[in-house]
C-alpha cells in the first residue's frame, strides 16, 4: 500500500501522469483557474473512476453525477483498477464553468497511464502469496492476524560447506531455497513506460544487516540463477526489465530477534520517474511488505521425543546402555557422542538446548549452543548443524560466564494459562538469584536473546542456593492424562523426611542408604536413623525446602498452577561450601521420553526387598500411566554433581500450535 499522490493540472497544456492500479491519485484543480469560475465538471474515459469528496465529514461521491460548486475544500480522487495497454490511453477532463456563461470557461486535461505494481508474499500465513486487502505494512499477531514470516537460514544444506547457509552471498544448493521465503514482484503496463521509469527494490541499512534477498535471474533449477541483490552493505537494487509478468525473489533471515532487533523487517518497491534529464528522479509509488523473523522455540519435556543424545565416556558404559534401552522403548533415535569428540565432557544437557523455528512452509530444528564452552564446545556446530538442522549461539562479549549459563538451567513449561493470559507455547524457566541480591545470574546476552523471541516469556527462579545452580536440580515436568495435561515435579526434603519417619515408625530405622553402589570409590552407607538424627542435615534441608517453596509460589503464580498440579518427590540435599548438592541421586533430574521415565537410581533404604524411595516415586507417577526406569548414574554422574537429565538431551516434536496464532 502507498500514500496518495497529488497531480496538478494546467489550462495551458495537457498534463500526463502515471498512476498505479488500485491506488488513489489526488487531482489538484486549483492551481490554474479561469477568472469567474464558480462551478466545475469532471469526466473520465472508461476505466477511470472519479470521486469528489466534499468534506472530511461527508462520504465521497462519484464526480460524473452532477456539476460541482467550485470550493477549495473539495478533493478530486481518481482511481484506475486495470493497467493500460498504451501510454496515455486514458484521461480525465475538467471543465471550469461560470454561472453567468453557457459554455465552459476553459478545460484542463490529464492523460493517465496505469501500471499495476505489487510486491507480494505470504501475507496471511497460509503458505501462499496473498494480494488481499490486508495492510502489508503491518504485522499482526493472533488467529486472525496476518503478515509474512521469515526463517533464519541457519542450517547447512551443502555438505561440502563449512559454514551456515546464510554466511555467504550465494545459493549453494537448490534445497537451500526451502529455508527461504518467496517474495514476488508483479508488474503490468506498457513496456515503453519503463524507458524513463525505474523500479527500485530497497530496504533500510538496519534491515539490510538482518536479511539477504536473492533475485531469480535465470532457470530456477540452476544455483547460478540466484543473484544476491540485497543484504549487508547493499540496501537497494534496480530491478531490470526482464520479460515476464512476475519477478521472483527469495529472502533469507540472517539473525534471530534479539536486543535491539524486534524481528520486524521491511522491503519496498518504488517506481521512480526518470523522464526529466534536468532534475533528479521523483518517486511515484511505493509498495511495502513486512516480514517477522520466526523465533527460536523451546520444547517442553511433555512433547513426544524424536532423538536422544548421550555422551560415551570412560566409566558410563552401563549408563549409555540403559539410556539406549529406554530410547528403544520410547521408539526414538539414539545419538551417542563418542569420547574422542566429547573429551570426557559428559554434560550434554548443559552444552545445548534443542528447539526449532517455523514458517508456514517449513519447520527447522535448531540447536542453541550454550556459552559454557566445555570440552563439548564443538559438538553442536560440528555434529548437529547440517542438512535441515540449524544452529544459533550467544557469547558474552567479555567471555564471562558462570555455571548458570549452562542449559541445565534452561527449561520450558508446557502450555499454561496464568492470570487470565494464555501461553500456548509455555514459558521459559531460567535460574538466577533473589531480587535485589548480588548472586549469580544468566549472562545478559542469553537473557536478551530468550526475551526477544516473545512467544515463551521468561520466568526467573531462585537457584543461587544450589552449588551447580540449575533449575533441573529441583523441578521437572511429566505428561499426565488429566488436568492440565502435565504435572510439575518438585524436589521435596519435607516429603523425604516424612517418608523416612514413616519407615522408622514401622521399625525400619536401621535400613541403609547407598547399599549396592558400585564405583571407583567406596561410598559410606547411612541408616534412616542416622539421617533423622543428623540435626545439621535436617537444618540444611529446612533451608533447601524454604528455597524450593519460594520457587513453588513463583511457579504457581506465573504458570497458573494449583497444588493438584504439583507432585512432591522425596529428595534430600547436603551442604557443600554453603551451597546445596543432592544427598542421594536427584530423582527429579530425570529423562522424560513420553510415558517412559529414566530416573536416577537413588540407592535408598531397602525395605522388604525394595528401595523405599523407588517405591514412593512409582506410587506417585505410575497412576498417571508413566513407566519408571531407575538408571544407575551414581559414579559417572551423581558423584560429579549431575544426574540423568544432565547427561542426556532430547530433540522433540514441535508444538502443533503455530506461534503466529498467539498474542504475546
Swiss-Prot record:
UniProt keyword Methyltransferase, yes or no: no
Needed co-factor(s): Ca(2+)
Tissue specificity annotation: Epidermis and hair follicles.
Catalysis performed (reactions): L-arginyl-[protein] + H2O = L-citrullyl-[protein] + NH4(+)
GO CC list: cytoplasm; nucleus
GO biological process, one term: arginine deiminase pathway
Main localization category: cytoplasm
Family from the record: Belongs to the protein arginine deiminase family.
Protein name, UniProt field: Protein-arginine deiminase type-3
Organism annotation: Rattus norvegicus (Rat)
Taxonomic lineage: Eukaryota, Metazoa, Chordata, Craniata, Vertebrata
Amino acid at each position: 500500500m502507498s500514500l496518495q499522490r497529488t497531480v496538478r493540472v494546467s489550462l495551458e497544456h495537457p498534463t500526463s501522469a502515471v498512476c498505479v492500479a488500485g491506488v488513489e491519485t489526488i487531482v489538484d484543480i486549483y492551481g490554474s483557474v479561469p477568472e469567474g469560475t464558480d462551478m466545475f465538471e469532471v469526466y473520465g474515459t472508461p476505466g477511470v473512476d472519479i470521486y469528489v469528496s466534499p468534506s472530511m465529514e461527508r462520504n465521497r461521491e462519484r464526480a460524473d453525477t452532477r456539476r460541482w460548486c467550485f470550493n477549495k475544500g473539495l478533493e478530486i480522487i481518481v482511481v484506475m483498477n486495470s493497467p493500460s495497454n498504451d501510454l496515455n490511453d486514458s484521461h480525465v477532463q475538467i471543465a471550469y464553468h461560470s454561472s453567468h456563461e453557457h459554455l465552459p470557461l476553459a478545460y484542463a486535461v490529464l492523460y493517465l497511464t496505469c501500471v499495476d505494481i505489487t510486491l507480494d508474499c505470504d501475507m496471511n500465513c497460509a503458505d501462499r502469496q496473498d494480494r488481499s486487502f490486508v495492510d502489508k505494512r503491518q504485522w499482526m499477531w493472533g488467529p486472525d492476524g496476518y503478515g509474512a514470516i521469515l526463517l533464519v537460514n541457519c542450517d547447512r544444506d551443502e555438505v561440502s560447506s563449512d559454514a551456515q547457509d546464510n554466511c555467504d552471498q550465494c545459493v549453494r544448493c537448490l534445497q537451500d531455497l526451502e529455508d527461504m521465503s518467496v517474495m514476488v514482484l508483479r508488474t503490468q503496463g506498457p513496456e515503453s513506460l519503463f524507458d524513463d521509469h525505474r523500479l527500485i527494490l530497497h530496504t533500510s541499512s538496519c534491515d539490510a544487516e538482518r536479511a539477504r534477498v536473492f533475485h531469480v535471474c535465470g532457470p530456477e533449477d540452476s544455483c547460478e540463477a540466484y543473484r544476491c541483490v540485497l543484504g549487508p552493505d547493499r540496501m537497494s537494487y534496480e530491478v531490470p526489465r526482464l520479460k515476464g509478468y512476475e519477478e521472483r525473489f527469495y529472502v533469507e533471515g540472517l539473525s534471530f530477534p534479539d536486543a535491539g532487533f524486534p524481528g520486524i523487517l521491511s522491503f519496498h518497491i518504488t517506481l521512480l520517474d526518470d523522464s526529466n534529464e534536468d532534475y533528479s528522479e521523483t518517486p511515484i509509488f511505493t509498495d511495502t511488505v513486512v516480514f517477522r523473523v520466526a523465533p527460536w522455540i523451546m520444547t517442553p519435556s511433555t512433547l513426544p521425543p524424536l532423538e536422544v543424545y548421550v555422551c560415551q565416556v570412560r566409566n558410563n558404559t552401563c549408563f549409555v546402555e540403559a539410556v539406549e534401552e529406554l530410547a528403544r522403548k520410547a521408539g526414538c533415535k539414539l545419538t551417542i557422542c563418542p569420547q574422542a569428540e566429547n573429551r570426557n565432557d559428559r554434560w550434554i544437557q548443559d552444552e545445548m538446548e534443542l528447539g526449532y523455528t517455523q514458517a508456514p512452509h517449513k519447520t527447522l530444528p535448531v540447536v542453541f549452543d550454550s556459552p559454557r564452552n566445555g570440552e563439548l564446545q564443538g559438538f553442536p556446530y560440528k555434529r548437529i548443524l547440517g542438512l535441515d538442522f540449524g544452529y544459533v549461539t550467544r557469547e558474552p562479549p567479555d567471555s564471562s560466564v558462570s555455571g548458570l549459563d549452562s542449559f541445565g538451567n534452561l527449561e520450558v513449561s508446557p502450555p499454561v494459562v496464568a492470570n487470565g493470559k494464555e501461553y500456548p507455547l509455555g514459558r521459559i524457566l531460567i535460574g538466577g538469584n533473589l531480587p535485589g541480591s548480588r548472586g549469580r545470574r544468566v549472562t545478559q546476552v542469553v537473557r536478551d536473546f530468550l526475551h526477544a523471541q516473545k512467544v515463551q516469556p521468561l520466568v526467573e527462579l531462585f537457584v543461587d542456593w544450589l552449588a551447580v545452580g540449575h533449575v533441573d536440580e529441583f523441578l521437572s515436568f511429566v505428561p499426565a492424562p488429566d488436568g492440565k495435561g502435565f504435572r510439575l515435579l518438585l524436589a521435596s526434603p519435607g516429603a523425604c523426611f516424612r517418608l523416612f519417619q514413616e519407615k522408622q515408625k514401622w521399625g525400619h530405622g536401621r535400613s541403609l542408604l547407598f547399599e549396592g553402589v558400585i564405583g571407583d570409590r567406596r561410598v559410606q552407607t547411612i541408616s534412616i536413623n542416622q539421617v533423622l538424627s543428623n540435626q545439621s542435615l535436617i537444618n540444611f534441608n529446612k533451608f533447601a525446602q524454604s528455597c524450593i517453596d519460594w520457587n513453588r509460589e513463583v511457579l504457581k503464580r506465573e504458570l497458573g498452577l494449583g497444588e493438584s498440579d504439583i507432585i512432591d518427590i522425596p529428595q534430600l540435599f547436603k551442604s557443600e561450601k554453603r551451597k546445596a548438592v543432592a544427598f542421594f541421586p536427584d530423582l527429579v533430574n530425570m529423562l522424560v521420553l513420553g510415558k517412559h521415565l529414566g530416573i536416577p537410581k537413588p540407592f535408598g533404604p531397602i525395605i522388604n526387598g525394595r528401595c523405599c524411595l523407588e517405591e514412593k516415586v512409582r506410587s506417585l507417577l505410575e497412576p498417571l500411566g508413566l513407566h519408571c526406569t531407575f538408571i544407575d548414574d551414581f559414579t559417572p554422574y551423581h558423584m560429579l554433581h549431575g544426574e540423568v537429565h544432565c547427561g542426556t538431551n532430547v530433540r522433540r516434536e514441535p508444538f502443533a500450535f503455530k506461534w503466529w496464532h498467539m498474542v504475546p
